[in-house]
Amino acid sequence: MNFKIKKLNRLAISIVSFAAMSAINYTIIHNPIVLLSCFILLIHELGHYIMAKHYKANAQFPIFIPLIIASVGITQVFDLEDQYKSNVALAGPLLASCFIICLMLFNFLYKLFSTKFLLLFLTSEILLNYIGLDGKKYRKFKQNNLSVSFS
């Protein structure tokens, strides 16, 4: 019961923050660029959440405050082995990149020119996570395999 209340509280925080931001700037809810960016950020965080749940880490329902912060509460991720930490760290950018690539293919097929450059920008923004800017990660090569670890 307590777990469901925590989930609802986190969801309520996310909804209230999105409503507050749309009240501050009315065009935020009608701007497809902002909505697409928020949706891709949500998919990014859900990638971390799903992978952490897969490895049975204590991941909590994500708090999502659009355009300011999004976080997944994972308290046991540091107890995992390096291989599993790497997978949890890479799951968010990989899932978001796959989603963006699918949107780009859809746009190129249906010739929606208005969002092509936005999707290219978002792809490059998500791919920046692989070079160590997300969560103080660094790369190291170990036995000819790339693994991402927390510093």
Residue ranges, per PLM feature:
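Hydrophobic transmembrane alpha-helices and their immediate loop junctions
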Residues: M1-S151
